[in-house]
């Protein structure tokens, strides 16, 4: 575990941010920025609004030897109870916008909220992105994990990704990026910052699009814990198949292992959908981590299958 940032280090760092007119906030409880509603107080959140500010803040991080992590919508994330040994970077301003470029092409900022953004784009009469209207979080995070459901993935639609890597700007086509099921190369490159994407959609029938939006919304609502604080599916489906060719789902393995409804502290493996862990109101990151380890061990004991996490950890979680 890294040491807590010193007061003098933070003071000089914040003074430089003020001089550079880069927006920031101090002493922010990160739990309020996550769908899990779990996470302790971070000393500083820096919120750059334009690309030049992102480049500048990376230089400032390096100058003051400040460890940092980037936070998006916080929907597929378990945040540390003590995120006090790093600074959080969270895009704002123009990164929250999307614009039509014409002929079904859209430029979408990394800090746009996926659910309303892709619903609005679909309701303009373009089809292919309806499934993304059911996925919470921000577009940047959806890119990093190649978010998908109902047979669709974000990279099916992407024309290009704009990102910073080691302070240098890149625009890459999907063919130039490693990606797969709930995976992209950005997952393993913590020095990369997604700034935005361009996608290409086809024109469609608005009535059929509205019907598709409703169908996917209803399916999502019926298959997930209702009005519960969670981070979505905890484990990836293992890509293991039965003799009849049907894929074995992660939730089935949890259920067969008798894990449905298990509780640790304020966290519970959902009785409604056991590939979800829910915050009953007082859960800590440690509570959730305990249940994750329990699932991995128990499922391996009962099935011989090793499950991999879909949610990401943010900070040190014992």
Swiss-Prot record:
GO terms for cellular component: cytosol. SUPFAM superfamilies: FAD-binding/transporter-associated domain-like, Uridine diphospho-N-Acetylenolpyruvylglucosamine reductase, MurB, C-terminal domain. Keywords: Cell cycle, Cell division, Cell shape, Cell wall biogenesis/degradation, Cytoplasm, FAD, Flavoprotein, NADP, Oxidoreductase, Peptidoglycan synthesis. The keyword Cell cycle applies. It holds the Pfam family FAD_binding_4. The active site is at 182, 233 (proton donor), 310. Residues 212-229 have a biased composition (Basic and acidic residues). GO terms for molecular function: FAD binding; flavin adenine dinucleotide binding; UDP-N-acetylmuramate dehydrogenase activity. Pathway: Cell wall biogenesis; peptidoglycan biosynthesis. Residues 38-204 form the FAD-binding PCMH-type domain. Belongs to the MurB family. The keyword NADP applies. Cell wall formation. Residues 212-232 are annotated as: Disordered. It comes from the Bacteria. It catalyses: UDP-N-acetyl-alpha-D-muramate + NADP(+) = UDP-N-acetyl-3-O-(1-carboxyvinyl)-alpha-D-glucosamine + NADPH + H(+). PANTHER family: UDP-N-ACETYLENOLPYRUVOYLGLUCOSAMINE REDUCTASE. This is UDP-N-acetylenolpyruvoylglucosamine reductase. Its EC number is 1.3.1.98. One of its GO terms (biological process) is peptidoglycan biosynthetic process. The gene is murB. It is found in: Cytoplasm. It is an enzyme of class 1 (oxidoreductase).
């Amino acid at each position: 575990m890294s040491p807590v940032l010193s007061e003098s280090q933070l003071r000089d760092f914040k003074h430089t941010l003020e001089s550079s007119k880069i927006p920031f906030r101090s002493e922010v409880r990160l739990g309020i920025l996550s769908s899990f509603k779990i996470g302790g107080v971070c000393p500083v959140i820096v919120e750059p609004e334009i690309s030049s500010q992102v480049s500048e803040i990376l230089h400032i991080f390096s100058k003051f030897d400040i460890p940092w992590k980037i936070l998006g919508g916080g929907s597929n994330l378990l945040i540390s109870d003590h995120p006090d040994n790093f600074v959080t970077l969270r895009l704002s301003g123009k990164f929250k916008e999307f614009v039509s470029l014409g002929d079904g092409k859209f430029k979408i900022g990394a800090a746009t909220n996926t659910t309303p953004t892709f619903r609005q784009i679909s309701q303009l009469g373009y089809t292919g992105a309806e499934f993304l209207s059911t996925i919470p979080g921000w577009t940047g995070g959806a890119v990093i994990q190649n978010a998908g459901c109902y047979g669709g993935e974000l990279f099916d639609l992407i024309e290009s990704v704009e990102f910073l890597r080691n302070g240098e700007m890149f625009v890459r086509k999907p063919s130039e990026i490693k990606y797969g099921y709930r995976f992209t190369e950005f997952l393993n490159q913590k020095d990369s910052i997604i700034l935005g994407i361009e996608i290409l959609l086809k024109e469609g029938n608005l009535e059929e699009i509205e019907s598709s939006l409703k169908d996917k919304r209803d399916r999502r609502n019926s298959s997930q814990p209702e009005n519960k604080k969670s981070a979505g599916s905890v484990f990836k489906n293992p890509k293991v198949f039965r003799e009849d060719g049907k894929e074995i789902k992660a939730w089935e393995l949890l259920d067969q292992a008798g894990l449905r409804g298990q509780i640790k502290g304020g966290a519970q493996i959902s009785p409604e959908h056991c590939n979800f862990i829910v915050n009953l109101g007082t859960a800590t990151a440690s509570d959730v981590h305990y249940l994750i380890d329990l699932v991995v061990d128990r499922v391996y004991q009962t099935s011989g299958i090793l499950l991999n996490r879909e949610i990401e950890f943010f900070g040190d979680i014992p």
